[in-house]
Amino acid sequence: MTRPLAPGFHIPPDLLLRAYATGVFPMAEHADDPEVFWVRPEMRGIIPLDKFHVPKSLRKLLRRQPYEVRYDTDFTGVIDACAEPSAERAETWINEPIRVAYTELFKRGHCHTVEAWREGKLVGGLYGVSLGRAFFGESMFSREPNASKICLVHLVERLKAGGFLLLDTQFTTDHLRRFGAIDVPRRRYEQMLAEALEETAKF
């Protein structure tokens, strides 16, 4: 983690994309903190797309199609929901400078959402950054059981179909490890990232 940017700092979209291209991403200590930190972990979380695992119980649920899955229809709704405290996380790292920066990336076509809807209501989702053949997962949320997990499955299917090579989760959690997430050393990650940036995929 590096020194913070000045309070209220606006992160230019081009700077943010360059940061991702070098393996760096921004975070805040909490939603009300005006400062942003650049982060470059020594161990990086990824989900190998060819080894993605769907738990048996979730496969059964997927066959029932409990939610309507949409893409890129409500970015504001998704990032706002990701920024809300929940039972799993009392604090969020999404502050106002980060919210503004990723909204600008979405307008440029470099940020995407996967959304779970039921009866016209957004009940789960995730968002992330697309660059070259790499997708950087940022955050997810659920307002109904398994909604974000179903979005993750649909994300991986879409990345495979679009020719992506790398799904970066930044860190690993017990939840993500159930789907095949692993940690890789920074040097190895940077090699994988460089390869993924050589060509372009389609989200």
From Swiss-Prot:
GO molecular function, one term: leucyl-tRNA--protein transferase activity
Keywords noted in UniProt: Acyltransferase, Cytoplasm, Transferase
Broad EC category: transferase
Main location: cytoplasm
Gene Ontology cellular-component terms listed: cytoplasm
Keyword check for Transferase: yes
Reactions the enzyme catalyzes: N-terminal L-lysyl-[protein] + L-leucyl-tRNA(Leu) = N-terminal L-leucyl-L-lysyl-[protein] + tRNA(Leu) + H(+); N-terminal L-arginyl-[protein] + L-leucyl-tRNA(Leu) = N-terminal L-leucyl-L-arginyl-[protein] + tRNA(Leu) + H(+); L-phenylalanyl-tRNA(Phe) + an N-terminal L-alpha-aminoacyl-[protein] = an N-terminal L-phenylalanyl-L-alpha-aminoacyl-[protein] + tRNA(Phe)
E.C. code: 2.3.2.6
Protein's job: Functions in the N-end rule pathway of protein degradation where it conjugates Leu, Phe and, less efficiently, Met from aminoacyl-tRNAs to the N-termini of proteins containing an N-terminal arginine or lysine.
Family, per entry: Belongs to the L/F-transferase family.
Designated name of the protein: Leucyl/phenylalanyl-tRNA--protein transferase
Native organism taxonomy: Bacteria, Pseudomonadati, Pseudomonadota, Alphaproteobacteria, Hyphomicrobiales
